[in-house]
Structures are given as C-alpha cells and as structure tokens.
Swiss-Prot record:
Designated name of the protein: Glutamine synthetase leaf isozyme, chloroplastic
Region Disordered: start-end pairs: 1-33, 101-126
Top-level taxon: Eukaryota
Organism: Hordeum vulgare
Keyword ATP-binding: yes
InterPro entries noted in UniProt: Gln_synt_N (IPR008147), Gln_synt_N_sf (IPR036651), Gln_synth/guanido_kin_cat_dom (IPR014746), Gln_synth_cat_dom (IPR008146), Gln_synth_gly_rich_site (IPR027303), Gln_synth_N_conserv_site (IPR027302), Glutamine_Synthetase (IPR050292)
One GO MF term attached to the UniProt entry: glutamine synthetase activity
Domain GS beta-grasp: 81-161
GO biological processes: glutamine biosynthetic process
Function: The light-modulated chloroplast enzyme, encoded by a nuclear gene and expressed primarily in leaves, is responsible for the reassimilation of the ammonia generated by photorespiration.
C-alpha cells in the first residue's frame, strides 16, 4: 500500500499516484474531495493528514470505503470515545499502545481505568506471571482519530503495585514532588533530534542507496528538493502535536541530511517527560503511515556526519531571577562532580556520538562554556549578559529517557550537595567562582 499527504499541495511522502478519484485530462488522477482529515472537517482544522492508498485500481472501492471509515467523526452518534493507552516497552525506548472504549469523554487521567497487557510479549515480565498494569498519567487529544478521542500516557506496574524496571516515570515523579524541587519550578526545553530512514534499505531519507550525499554544510535549516528530505513528515508532526496539546515550540532541518529536530517546552517538572513521549509516539505513527522508518540512534551513520542528540535546556526559579548566573555556575559545578552518573543515564550508544567532534564534547571529559557547542554544558550569551537564565546540557543522546534526564538534572542541582572539599577542587578545575 501507499500513502499520500492529504493537503492542498501535490505529491507526498511515498508514492505519487492517487487511484480512486478517477482521471482528469491527460490521464492525471482527479483531486479527491476535501472531506475530513483525522475525523475533523478540513474547514474546521487546517492540518495535514495521511491518506491510505492502493497500489492498483482493482482495489480502489475498498480503499475508498476504508478511508471513509478512518475519517469518520463518531461524535454526533455516540458519547463513547476511543482511548489509546501508550507505554514504554522492554527496550526502554520502544513504544507500545492499544485501544479501548471509554463510556464518555474525560478531562483527567484519574477518570480512566487501569488496564493490563502481556508483559511477556514486550520483554517486561515472565510468561508464567505476565500481567503488567497500566496506570494512566497524562492525556492528549488524538490527532489521528479526532473528536473527543484521546492518547493516554501510562506508566507500568506489577499487579502488586510496584513499578517495573522500565518505569522511569515513577522515580521522576518522586523527585519532582519533593518540596525543594517544586519550590524551584524547574523548566525544561528539550531538543529532540531524529533521523528518517528508507524502510527497505535502512539508509537515510534522501541519500542515494549505497552511496552518500555531498558533505555537510548545505542541509541545516535548508530549503530545496536537493537539500531537504522529509519536510512533510516534520510539518505533519508539528501540526499534530499542536492539535494534541503538546508544548511543541519549533522544528528545523538538521546538519545531516535526512535528520530533523523539534523542540518541546518550556515544560514544568514531570510534564517534560510526558510531552516528549507523547510527541515521539505521534512521530512514530506518522512515519508508519508514510512508509518511512524513524530512528533515534545517536549516531546512525558513522564517519564525518553529525550524530543525533536530545539537548536539554534547564532552569530553576533561582536561575531565572536576578543573580541567577551564580546559581547556574553552582549547578554546573554539581553536574561536573556527577558527570559519570549522568553519562550512564543519558542514552544507549552515546559513546559513538560524544567524540569531541561534530558539535559534541568528549564523553570522558566534563566541560562548560559560553556559546560553545563543543562543551558538555553550554550557557547562552544572553544568559551571561543578563546575569540570569538557563543552561543547556548537550550530553543526552536522542534515545534518552526524558523522565530520567530531567529528574537527574533536578536531583543533582537542587537536592544533592557535594562535600566542601570536592566542591573546591571542582571549582578550581573548571575556573568557577561560586
């Protein structure tokens, strides 16, 4: 099967024929009626969708009827809604989901029932005791089904109520509920990089199969069919996240062709992790429909190509107030003393990315600097000039767990205190006056 982006432009992500609409002049397929996109009329919501298309005219009628069902808005006919329960799988990076009917629209996750799944099929439980329980934690509008349907971010527990090992949200929620942390109102802005791959050849989108494009330089924030690959996916994801209620704040093409970035935030506390996981789920669904593979590998292509990170911008209330630069420097000092702990928690395969090249610091050495993208921690010139603001932790890999990274930043900079001796030695080494 093929898919086509269903908007007012021509062409699409995969496939360019539009069977089922009849033919216009010169054999060109006729444009389909505007209809409904993701369950909402186009007039009501100007956004991009993906249409399911057949490979040949013999199945046109079936595909048209299926698309009508996919686009159907059930709101006028029933109060029932569809809730898509989403959770992190056994690898700690894969996402799983399944759907259930809820009797009426809901506004808060506390209104939703717990559910269960077969943990032996996700690598999260043994076959003889396979039940894992889903606890609904956050709700987003469903951009695929529209209407009152929802996406539900869940975390995972044993039947006895204990968090399973891949449940990183539970630990993060404990840290973010600490009074010392809540009083500091921690803000996070996360830059999620990702790479789009051709499905059948496992090679970046826009790259010649078995070959390489021209060197890096022309692709960052570029326009043009020879420099930008996958913009429809990035734009569809952007709009879908806005519709869902995710705090997405921007997108851009990245340095390596076929690689993109979007930013989520500022988000407070545990919300940062919920919004990143929900945004990843939506991106995975869109690439699924587009016939393109999404990878969060931090170094998908070896050689003179940029890796993929998940830079995490962070501030506390004290950092954002007058005199905040001194608080930022104290936070940097603490982060330097726990560098190994953070690196171990910042994503799989990060050693292939943090080489000291391609806008990264060395994985084994902690460093900081103003406007220096080759450091572990970067401070912006605006923060330096104003004497307050935020820091950017450039170490996290694109496949990092956002619950782990955000909670660890808060713990290290707010709750943890080094010994005076260790603090003095680190301050001298980093040339920090705190």
């Amino acid at each position: 099967m093929q898919v086509r982006r269903d908007d007012d432009g021509a062409g699409g992500c995969a496939g360019d024929a539009v069977p089922g609409g009849g033919e216009g002049q010169d054999g060109v397929p006729a444009r389909q009626p505007a209809g409904r996109v993701w369950g909402v009329s186009r007039a009501a919501r100007a956004t991009s969708g993906f249409k399911v298309l057949a490979l040949g005219p013999e199945t046109t009628g079936v595909i048209q009827r299926m698309q009508q069902l996919l686009d159907m808005d059930t709101t006028p006919f029933t109060d029932k809604i569809i809730a898509e329960y989403i959770w992190v799988g056994g690898s700690g990076i894969d996402l799983r989901s399944k759907s259930r009917t809820i009797s009426k629209p809901v506004e808060d996750p506390s209104e939703l029932p717990k559910w269960n799944y077969d943990g032996s099929s996700t690598g999260q439980a043994p076959g003889e005791d396979s039940e894992v329980i889903l606890y609904p934690q956050a709700i987003f509008k469903d951009p695929f089904r529209g209407g009152n349907n929802i996406l539900v971010i869940c975390d995972t527990y044993t039947p006895q109520g204990e968090p399973i090992p891949t449940n990183k949200r539970h630990m993060a929620a404990q840290i973010f509920s600490d009074p010392k942390v809540t009083s500091q109102v921690p803000w996070f802005g996360i830059e999620q990089e990702y790479t789009l791959m051709q499905r059948d050849v496992n090679w970046p989108l826009g790259w010649p199969v078995g070959g390489y494009p021209g060197p890096q330089g022309p692709y960052y924030c570029a326009v043009g069919s020879d420099k930008s690959f996958g913009r429809d996916i990035s734009d569809a994801h952007y709009k879908a996240c806005l519709y869902a209620g995710i705090e997405i704040s921007g997108t851009n093409g990245e340095v390596m062709p076929g690689q993109w970035e979007y930013q989520v935030g500022p988000s407070v506390g545990i919300d940062a992790g919920d919004h990143i996981w929900a945004s990843r789920y939506i991106l995975e669904r869109i690439t699924e429909q587009a016939g393109v593979v999404l990878t969060l590998d931090p170094k998908p292509i070896q050689g003179d190509w940029n890796g993929a990170g998940c830079h995490t911008n962070y501030s506390t209330l004290s950092m954002r107030e007058d005199g905040g630069f001194d608080v930022i420097k104290k936070a940097i000092l603490n982060l330097s003393l726990r560098h190994d702990l953070h690196i171990a928690a910042y994503g799989e395969g990060n050693e292939r990315r943090l080489t000291g090249l391609h806008e990264t610091a060395s994985i084994s050495d902690f460093s900081w600097g103003v406007a220096n993208r080759g450091c572990s921690i970067r401070v912006g010139r605006d923060t330096e000039a104003k004497g307050k603001g935020y820091l950017e932790d450039r170490r996290p890999a694109s496949n990092m767990d956002p619950y782990t990274v955000t909670a660890l930043l808060a713990e290290t900079t707010i709750l943890w205190e080094p010994t005076l001796e260790a603090e003095a030695l680190a301050a001298k080494k980093l040339a920090l006056k705190v």
